[in-house]
């Protein structure tokens, strides 16, 4: 294959230019003057998988407060789920799941998944763009950061990247995102700390040795130049391909390709993890959670747009976990969902919900402590359009927990990475 085709997108001096390697999309690492590597050793082979629910997921129809069902139903007369249809959770009679979440229910009841209730931050922002930026960078609501929380973690754990990498102890990309543009979560002090694979088709083009010709345009000239400063990124094409080609059989629980884009992304992640990549953090995403209208079907609220979105997540996570088990890689992986915000307590007249504050997140893996962290949100007896779910847990407590207790970031480094100290949660 033509290695020079590995780059499709690269950020250099703030400019994005197209590059070509079988459709791969990547932010290349420009030269910098970082301190040299100091013999850093990989603390463990654990992997964190982040699942972004883009648009603001409705937490109250995802995790239902059964103990307040009357208030829940009164606040949402046009979208409330029937109490006879919601999914029970072993040992937690006061809480249930949306009927579309059967795979996540099974993981929970098997002791391999948990819920953190009412996750948000002080003074929540209701803009999609700003709220997403807050979650990606790990900032306060009134502070702008130009680095991502995962980027700071990777920069702290792998000093000297990219100049001193790959190394014998870390020969692989530090982070991988399935998406055309690297997320701000992976932004380091000087450059992105990970690679972005544009889409599943691009991934399989690489694995199957499909090639493209360098275009005879001004972009081709820029390609030749950028290759010289992106040789380290180019090296990663080989290790990604080697890892992927070592896995020839995966779970049959995945939907057919194209039927569930999130499942397609997680299938790639499973293949790379099981193939031996030491990449620490993966990011995948699925969208359309901005359910202002027609969130549920009026004649059957267990169906409709939100149900389809949640089913997509549940089926993808279920297949992913089944795949990891079959590939003997499940013990290495912890996953979690997140969304930029939740929705209001009261549904609107359009059969939807408007931008809100706190919402639950799911976490899963063989090594997690299953259960529910926190209590059901307290619902008013007569909700108004302005009522929000109150925060119980700062989202940076979730980050601190997975960084310190799953990825083994020293407690002394949490302040540097998260710009503060946050209580740990019993997730691991």
Regions found by a protein language model. Name each.
Residues 343-350:
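Basic/polar, cationic surfaces and motifs that engage anionic cell-wall
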Residues 47, 332-333:
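Alpha-helical scaffolds flanking conserved acidic
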Residues 1-315, 319-327, 346, 360-428:
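Feature for exported/extracytoplasmic and membrane-associated proteins, marking the mature portion
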Residues 334-342:
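Acidic/histidine-rich, metal-coordinating catalytic segments
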Residues 350-361:
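C-terminal, helix-dominated tail/subdomain
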């Amino acid at each position: 294959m033509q290695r020079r085709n590995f780059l499709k997108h690269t950020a250099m001096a703030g400019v994005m230019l197209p590059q070509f390697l079988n459709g791969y999309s990547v932010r290349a690492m420009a030269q910098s003057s970082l301190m040299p590597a100091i013999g850093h050793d990989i603390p463990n082979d654990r992997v964190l998988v982040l699942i972004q629910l883009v648009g603001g997921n409705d937490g109250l129809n995802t995790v239902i407060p059964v103990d307040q069902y009357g208030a829940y139903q009164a606040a949402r007369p046009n979208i409330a789920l029937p109490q006879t249809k919601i999914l029970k959770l072993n040992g937690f009679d006061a809480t249930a799941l949306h009927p579309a979440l059967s795979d996540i229910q099974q993981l929970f009841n098997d002791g391999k998944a948990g819920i953190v209730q009412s996750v948000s931050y002080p003074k929540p922002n209701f803009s999609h763009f700003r709220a997403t930026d807050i979650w990606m960078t790990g900032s306060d609501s009134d502070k702008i950061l130009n680095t991502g929380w995962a980027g700071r973690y990777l920069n702290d754990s792998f000093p000297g990247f990219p100049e001193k990498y790959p190394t014998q102890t870390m020969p692989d990309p530090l982070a991988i995102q399935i998406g055309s543009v690297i997320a701000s979560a992976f932004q380091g002090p000087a450059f992105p700390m990970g690679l972005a694979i544009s889409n599943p088709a691009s991934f399989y083009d690489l694995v199957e040795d499909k090639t493209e010709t360098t275009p005879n345009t001004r972009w081709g000239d820029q390609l030749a130049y950028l290759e010289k400063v992106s040789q380290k990124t180019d090296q990663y094409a080989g290790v990604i391909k080697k890892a992927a080609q070592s896995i020839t059989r995966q779970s049959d629980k995945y939907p057919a390709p194209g039927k569930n884009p999130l499942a397609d992304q997680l299938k790639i992640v499973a293949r790379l993890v099981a193939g031996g990549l030491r990449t620490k953090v993966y990011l995948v995403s699925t969208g359309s959670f901005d359910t202002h209208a027609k969130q549920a079907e009026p004649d059957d609220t267990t169906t409709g747009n939100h149900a389809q979105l949640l089913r997509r997540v549940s089926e993808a996570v279920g297949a992913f976990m089944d795949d990891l088990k079959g590939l003997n890689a499940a013990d290495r992986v912890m996953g979690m969902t997140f969304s930029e915000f939740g929705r209001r307590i009261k549904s609107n007249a359009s059969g939807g919900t408007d931008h809100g504050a706190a919402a639950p997140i799911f976490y899963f893996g063989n090594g997690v402590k299953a259960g529910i962290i926190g209590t059901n949100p307290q619902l008013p007896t007569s909700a108004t359009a302005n009522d929000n779910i109150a925060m119980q847990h700062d989202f940076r407590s979730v980050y601190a927990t997975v960084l310190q207790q799953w990825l083994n970031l020293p407690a002394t480094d949490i302040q540097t990475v998260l710009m503060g100290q946050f209580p740990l949660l019993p997730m691991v």
